């Protein structure tokens, strides 16, 4: 089973606040530098890595001299704004020592709930990975409240795994992994080495919330693993204090707890497309496009003869034959008005007709499911 992590080409690594800030003592730049070194090693092995890092609020608290986490929302958001500056600078310095560029991306749950913004974020992250850049993601704590209230960066890591169709999510924490009971209270507690992410019994084992610095606790990590599994990603929960933890995990060493998915990212995505999309419009295809889609290819503008309905980029549309039969459905890369302007045209003409080009396809095959 550990080969699932070794074979993962695209990995999301989530690092918790307690690790980043050395349990609230300030940014642990030595540890951050070591994770950068390990991620550089993974990049050298041909893997793409996205880093989801907590720590902005905790770093801000330390800079402001606050010993206890405040309850007032405006103070938490102020701490996040102060701490984010130092957090990103420390990572930039660490990765630059390995000749790696980094990119800061601050997300909110709304960015991933809105289909248009979801596709924009997906395109940006995919481009950064193709350029060899290491994206560093955090929740935009300064303007949102959900993450601050609930300590939700574990869930953010799972959502990012879904966004980029990652093969694995690695959650580094200050614990060894999931235990059958709280090892601080039960001497008979044992480490869960691996199991299906969908196994609901793990929630009972996970217990309650985290510390004053780390807000998540094991329960949010288990739920993040369940969410990641629904998009086909395997999750490993392991100690970030282990020497070379990331490197050893990608060498199939049995560290921490592996919670594996039962379907691949693409299979899971196709199932989601088939089950959950509400159609906003129709694309009527010529015979050549029908054959192309049934052969597993993407839908190009040249194959569309008519556009039905009004919709925005990222909406779900049905791809139909001239006779009205639904051939496929998927997420469209352009709005209905834009689709009408580029229908029956070559992809090379998109930029000339629209003034920009998002994608050469109207619907990419990975965002499409045949009927």
Curated annotation (Swiss-Prot):
One GO cellular component from the entry? cytosol
Q: Where does ATP bind?
A: 14, 173-174
EC numbers listed for it are: 2.7.2.11
* Keywords in alphabetical order: Amino-acid biosynthesis, ATP-binding, Cytoplasm, Kinase, Nucleotide-binding, Proline biosynthesis, Transferase
The cross-references to CDD domains, in alphabetical order and at most eight, read: AAK_G5K_ProB (cd04242), PUA_G5K (cd21157)
Q: In which pathway does it act?
A: Amino-acid biosynthesis; L-proline biosynthesis; L-glutamate 5-semialdehyde from L-glutamate: step 1/2
What does it catalyze? L-glutamate + ATP = L-glutamyl 5-phosphate + ADP
Q: Give the top-rank taxon of the lineage listed in the UniProt record for this protein.
A: Bacteria
The family annotation for this protein states: Belongs to the glutamate 5-kinase family.
**Protein name as catalogued:** Glutamate 5-kinase
Q: Which organism is it from?
A: Aromatoleum aromaticum (strain DSM 19018 / LMG 30748 / EbN1) (Azoarcus sp. (strain EbN1))
Q: Which gene encodes it?
A: proB
């Amino acid at each position: 089973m550990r080969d699932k992590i070794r074979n993962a080409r695209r990995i999301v690594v989530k690092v918790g606040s307690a690790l980043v800030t050395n349990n609230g003592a300030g940014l642990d730049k030595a540890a951050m530098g070591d994770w950068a070194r390990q991620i550089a090693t993974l990049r050298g092995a041909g893997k793409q890595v996205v880093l989801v890092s907590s720590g902005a609020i905790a770093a801000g608290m330390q800079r402001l001299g606050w010993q206890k986490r405040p309850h007032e929302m405006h103070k938490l958001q102020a701490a996040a704004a102060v701490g984010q500056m130092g957090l990103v600078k420390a990572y930039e310095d660490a990765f630059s020592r390995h000749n790696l560029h980094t990119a800061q991306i601050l997300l909110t749950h709304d960015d991933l709930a809105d289909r248009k913004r979801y596709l924009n974020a997906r395109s940006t992250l995919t481009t950064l990975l193709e350029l060899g850049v290491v994206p560093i993601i955090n929740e935009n704590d300064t303007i949102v409240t959900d993450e601050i209230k609930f300590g939700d960066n574990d869930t953010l890591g799972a959502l990012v795994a879904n966004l980029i169709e990652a093969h694995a999510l690695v959650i580094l924490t200050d614990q060894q992994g999931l235990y059958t009971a709280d090892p601080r209270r039960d001497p008979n507690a044992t480490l869960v080495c691996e199991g299906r992410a969908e196994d609901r019994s793990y929630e009972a084992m996970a217990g309650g919330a985290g510390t004053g610095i780390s807000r998540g606790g094991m329960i949010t990590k288990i739920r993040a693993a369940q969410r990641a599994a629904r998009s086909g990603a395997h999750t490993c929960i392991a100690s970030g204090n282990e020497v070379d933890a990331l490197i050893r995990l990608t060498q199939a060493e049995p560290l921490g707890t592996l919670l594996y998915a039962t379907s691949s990212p693409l299979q899971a995505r196709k199932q989601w497309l088939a089950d959950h999309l509400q159609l906003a419009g129709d694309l009527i295809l010529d015979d050549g496009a029908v054959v192309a889609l049934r052969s597993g290819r993407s839908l190009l503008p040249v194959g569309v003869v008519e556009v039905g309905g009004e919709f925005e980029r990222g909406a779900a549309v049905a791809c139909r034959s001239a006779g009205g039969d639904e051939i496929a459905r998927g997420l469209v890369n352009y709005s209905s008005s834009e689709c009408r302007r580029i229908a029956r045209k070559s992809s090379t003409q998109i930029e000339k007709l629209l003034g920009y080009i998002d994608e050469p396809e109207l619907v990419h095959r990975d965002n499409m499911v045949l009927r």
